[in-house]
Amino acid sequence: MGSGDGSILINSIIGLALFAAAYSLWGGLAAVAWTDVVQVIVLIFGGLMMTYFALVNLGDGGSAIDGLKYVYETVPERFSMILSKGEIITPNGNDAWFDLPGLAVLIGGMWVANLYYWGFNQYIIQRTLAAKSLEEGQKGIAFAAFLKLLIPIFVVLPGIIVYVMNLDASGALAVSSLDQGFIGENGAIINDNAAPWLIKEIIPVGLKGLILAALAAAIVSSLASMVNSTSTIFTMDIYKSIINKKADDKSLVKVGRIAGLVALIVAILIAPQLKSLGQVFQYIQEYTGVVSPGILAVFLMGLFYKKASNNGAIWGVISSIPIAMYFKVGPNGWSSLSIFNHDIPFMNQMLITCLATMFIIFVVSKIEGNQDDPKGIVITKKLFSTSPTFNLSLIHISEPTRPID
């Protein structure tokens, strides 16, 4: 138990960091991948069990399906992904539209976030690049897409369940009777504490340890992958390419471990400061959006615009940072156009930044004379070909689900 001074948080952070370092720094990507196989099984099973027992509890003696119907009938608006401005106000008084800005969820910045994260982020694609063959890599992507479909069940749904469990007779959130674990230092409601509260209140004693282990597995898995990616990028793209071009494999391994260790130390120092941010995941997504649109724009233009130049890419990615930061700290009122108001949903900010960066790359490349790059990648149909197994998997994954009867 904690003493109230935050020591349990610090000890947990250090413990998880040391555990992740133990196998990611010395075992490399192979150790990370094999450990994740076990961790994902524990994570999915534990998450599904948490949701199941929570739904059974709401089912008033019935099944989990009865509980799900009760939740949907009580707060149907919480299952909507396309929101209008002012449609849902969060318990902290914020407009949920700023997180899910209407159709932008489907045709706007959501694509920027997803394409960057799943297609061009070293943290993710390192697993695919390490596959034995192209076909094996495609199978891994298809399986990951299937697992992604399960996330709403044990990540989103438990939060909605906790919300329903804390409603008063009038259907409003009973703020005055909320568990103190939901109340932050400034009086704001901490949404991220929904899962721990649900585990404490609903889950049988025998399963609490398993579900907590599942949560720890998710943290360690992400941390180990990030450490491995950080050490790889620093070692190969900075140390090997700039500092010591003649470094042998032994030196590279040593430098990679040191880089990963330094990254872990920095993470340990920063992590305790994040507890005051409310929804940490939302905060990470928003500020990752400062750099991701520019990176995505460079890759897309490089792949699909054969006359894109190196200077165009450089100017584009450099320009993307001040463009993105304008929406965070820039002044209001210098233009009547709403897109120049930095108080807009971060998903829309990401889309505008990405489009602006692509335009800069196009203009700079055009000024340079639009010369074909002899070293560029030649795009052919074969480059984007997929196996029949992969295609069938995508068909099943993309099939629409039936609504709750």
Give short role names for the model-derived ranges.
Residues M1-L394, S398, R402:
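Membrane-embedded helix-loop-helix hairpins and adjacent transmembrane boundary segments
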